[in-house]
Amino acid sequence: MASLRSATPRLRSYFRDKYIPQICEALLCGLLVTCPEDPLKYLEHMILAIIKRGLENLLWDTCIHPSLKSRVRRLSETYLDELFGLDDQLVTPELMIKACTFYTGHLVKTHFSGWKKVAIPRANQEEIMAEKMDKAIAHDNFRCQKYIFNRWFAYTVMSRERLITTLLRLRHLFYMQRQRIILAKWKERARHKSKTREDDLISKHELQLKKWKFKLGKPISLEGSLSDIAVENRRIAFDISVLPEQAILQIFLYLTFKDMMACSRVNRSWMAMIQRGSLWNSIDFSTVKNIADKCVVTTLQKWRLNVLRLNFRGCDFRTKTLKAVSHCKNLQELNVSDCQSFTDESMRHISEGCPGVLYLNLSNTTITNRTMRLLPRYFHNLQNLSLAYCRKFTDKGLQYLNLGNGCHKLIYLDLSGCTQVLVEKCPRISSVVLIGSPHISDSAFKALSSCDLKKIRFEGNKRISDACFKSIDRNYPGINHIYMVDCKGLTDSSLKSLSLLKQLTVLNLTNCIRIGDIGLKHFFDGPASIRLRELNLTNCSLLGDSSVIRLSERCPNLHYLNLRNCEHLTDLAIEYIASMLSLISVDLSGTLISNEGMTILSRHRKLREVSVSDCVNITDFGIRAYCKTSLLLEHLDVSYCSQLTDDIIKTIAIFCTRITSLNIAGCPKITDAGMEILSARCHYLHILDISGCIQLTDQIIQDLQIGCKQLRILKMQFCKSISPAAAQKMSSVVQHQEYNSDNPPHWFGYDSEGNPLDKIHSRVQLRTYSKLIVKEPFSIDEEDPDSKHQ
């Protein structure tokens, strides 16, 4: 061993590089521990195992069986350090002695210090113990204080959060309570204001009713003038002639021809006021009953240079009287519709003397092809021509319009009731009316494709189908009025085609029973709904609330809406209708609207025309709730609502004083007391329908004559308690009257005593009847050019 320690560096390096000490250590340790019977085979087997495992991972106990390995680590790394140790691995004897000395001294010092503390007690042990106890007590107090502080801090944080939450809740409750108080005060003030207004209206109503009853106590002349009957208060004298001339003209423009004649007989001042030429630009003879032919001739001769518009609708004059029209050289508009005495000879005289006519209405007259030949010869500037229900001219007569200079400026031609139409010679026609022409088919639209049509009106045609609208957006891009009534061949596909018309403003699909929610959805999704101002879906019974919801979203400019007999509409649809602030007219007749729906509809305070006819769920409460907020209401139709009583008449008289048209037909509970209140308050009433009001008597005739001076149309059918004599007196006051004293028919829903009949039987017949008398809402777009003369 000593010789190996003193070996050369080369040999020592060889031993270190080839792992000779580790190999020897592992083999020798294995032999010493294992003690095999055949050491050589054991060494051979271990050498092969060492070669297989490699020398880098060789440990001293590699050749020892795991069960024989030592469990306690030795102080020395190897057993052979002393034998084969290297300089950097071996511990020198000097270092070993020094280490043992240090270790022994450390043990002695440690054990001696411990023995010293135990064996030699200190003199101030009690003070030390007291000091330790003080430290322990202080530590324990600190620990307790820390624990308590942590608990207190957590409680304080939680209390603060709870306080903040409570304060926020209290503030929210305070704001809510304050809002409730403010809202309650506002409601109370609004209720008080409304109650004050109602009381004021009721007091005025009672005062006016007293004056009214005072009037009834005086003798009344039915033949008197149209001026008001004097009341107990003295009238203030006022001379109308001191007004500015423009104001006088505006006042007299509202008078009829009969009133003008009456004014001319008041005094010389009034006679002078009506001698202004501008008052005689338009003369309407259709409102006059039993006027002498001499008066007509005299008037036309006197104002022949001022007359621009003449209306003879329904007048029965002799031919020589109509010849006087030829003296009106500046005449521009002439209406002779329904004049059975108007012949081709009359037309010859007019055409020779009035070449400047622009608007000519010859509907329902006996003209023939001779008149059709005169039109292009003399009326070169004719723009609007109505030949509705003139059945004595032929297709050849219609072709005369292109003769000579022709009526090339014609833009409106009404051929309603004319079964054959040829318009290929009139390319400038923009409006076609084919009402009462059931033989027109889809091919007619192809013939009209060369015309720039703006308006189309069809009615009662079963041959028109969806095919006519297939290319309507390309053929008629500027069309704005479509009137397709009772065309049962139209389906949802037609609405899909119509949705592309950007200029459409009026759409009337009355009695198109195959139209449903799907078609309307396609229509409202298109650009056509943006400009739409009037929509009529009467008797389209397949429609539901979803269509109305979509309608309220896509039609911001809609003014007139007719949903009559759409039986699936409920109060939900009414809520969306009430949100359409552009509406001024709505027809909900025959729907399921109830009192709640009428209350919702009362939010819309701009409606002027409302129709809820045949709505069996409506009572006095619903009408009262609506009328109290509808001060602008002008037209109200509550016909066939048999539950209504005089209470609604009183409500209408108090709150709806501007009403001009009222329909209470089929309301058997209305009495003379209600009509007395109506006559005392509603002085602007023009149209009144009381058909089927079996409790009304002759007293209402006197009331209406006194209170409703402007009444023009009165319907009193099935009023058994009104005598023919009273009705005859009233006929001389109004322009149009319908009267009979028969018992109400079964489809009114009640008998002659007002007792209800079988609901199913009466309701079915009433619904059938309502389809026959569908009332078209007023619209400027649907008005004929010469309707203003009618």
UniProtKB/Swiss-Prot annotation:
Compartment(s) where it occurs, according to its Swiss-Prot or TrEMBL record: Cytoplasm, Cytoskeleton, Flagellum axoneme; Cytoplasm, Cytoskeleton, Microtubule organizing center, Centrosome
Domain F-box: 237-283
Residues spanning the signal sequence: none
UniProt KW keywords: Cell projection, Cilium, Cytoplasm, Cytoskeleton, Flagellum, Leucine-rich repeat, Repeat, Ubl conjugation pathway
Per-repeat ranges for LRR: 503-525, 531-552, 557-579, 582-602, 606-628, 632-657
SUPFAM superfamilies linked to this entry: F-box domain, RNI-like
GO cellular component: centrosome; cytoplasm; motile cilium
SMART domains for this protein: FBOX (SM00256), LRR_CC (SM00367)
One Pfam family linked to the record: F-box-like
InterPro entries reported in the protein's UniProt record: F-box-like_dom_sf, F-box_dom, Leu-rich_rpt, Leu-rich_rpt_Cys-con_subtyp, LRR_dom_sf
Subunit and interaction comment: Component of the nexin-dynein regulatory complex (N-DRC). Directly interacts with SKP1 and CUL1. Interacts with TCTE1/DRC5.
Family designation: Belongs to the DRC6 family.
Role of this protein: Substrate-recognition component of the SCF (SKP1-CUL1-F-box protein)-type E3 ubiquitin ligase complex. Component of the nexin-dynein regulatory complex (N-DRC), a key regulator of ciliary/flagellar motility which maintains the alignment and integrity of the distal axoneme and regulates microtubule sliding in motile axonemes. Specifically targets CEP192 isoform 3 for ubiquitin-mediated proteolysis and thereby acts as a regulator of microtubule nucleation activity.
The protein's name in its UniProt record: F-box and leucine-rich repeat protein 13
